[in-house]
């Protein structure tokens, strides 16, 4: 569903209005220095939030649009895989910028989520490894470089700073193999960051579990985490806030 349609359909919803206002705030307070890859476009703000990405062509704003689609797809359909998409999107766009600036010419989008864990932690991966060629060895080096950046250290502080993180994401006790994205996040945030044993496992999606999360303002928490992460990402890419 297009994000502008979501806002239209749910314009009276307080959570939707809250997120829309956050997008407006982001547009009004963020800027990026001109670079060879991404030149500033000072075009006027358009009412259609869905056009924001096309107007500015800024990777982090793209993340924000993707995040908004994810949250409100989750909100309207009760699909609870949004955390995976948030982190995957954040990683992919950051890596695309990194690759572009390094002029490596690598098609990063060929990498799917499970590749990340294989490249980051070859020995411990629970997935079947692919045949590595020179391009994937290059991916490995660049991804290792990517996750060592200050942005991810700050993100780690954000998501682990509140007690609600463990309150909401420590429910699944089943011994299941983690997904690639989960392995990636574990490599970045530490082995005690047990996402797979929580929201990313489809087996946790019982009616009672979902109802509990709705009652406990799950979406407000998700929005708060996503907003703080993206603010830090904006600063990292030379955006500034008043």
Feature-to-residue mapping (PLM):
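Arginine residue identity/basic-tract feature
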Residues: 54, 58, 88, 110, ...
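Predominantly late transmembrane helices and immediately cytosolic-facing juxtamembrane segments
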Residues: 101-105
């Amino acid at each position: 569903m297009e994000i502008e349609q979501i806002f239209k359909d749910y314009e009276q919803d307080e959570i939707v209005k809250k997120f829309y206002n956050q997008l407006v705030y982001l547009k009004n307070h963020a800027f990026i220095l001109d670079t060879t890859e991404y030149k500033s476009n000072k075009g006027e703000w358009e009412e259609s939030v869905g056009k924001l990405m096309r107007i500015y062509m800024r990777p982090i704003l793209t993340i924000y649009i993707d995040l908004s689609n994810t949250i409100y797809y989750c909100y309207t359909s009760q699909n609870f895989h949004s955390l995976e998409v948030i982190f995957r999107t954040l990683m992919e766009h950051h890596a695309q910028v990194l690759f572009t600036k390094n002029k490596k010419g690598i098609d990063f989008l060929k990498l799917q989520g499970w590749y990340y864990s294989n490249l980051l932690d070859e020995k411990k991966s629970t997935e079947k490894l692919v045949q590595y060629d020179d391009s994937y060895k290059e991916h490995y080096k660049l991804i290792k470089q990517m996750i060592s950046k200050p942005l991810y250290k700050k993100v780690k502080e954000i998501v682990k700073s509140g007690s609600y993180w463990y309150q909401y994401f420590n429910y699944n006790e089943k011994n299941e193999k983690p997904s690639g994205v989960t392995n990636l996040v574990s490599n970045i945030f530490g082995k005690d960051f047990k996402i797979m044993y929580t929201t990313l496992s489809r087996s946790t999606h019982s009616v009672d579990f979902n109802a509990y999360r709705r009652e406990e303002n799950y979406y407000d928490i998700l929005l708060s985490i996503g907003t703080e992460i993206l603010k830090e990402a904006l600063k990292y890419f030379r955006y500034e806030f008043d």
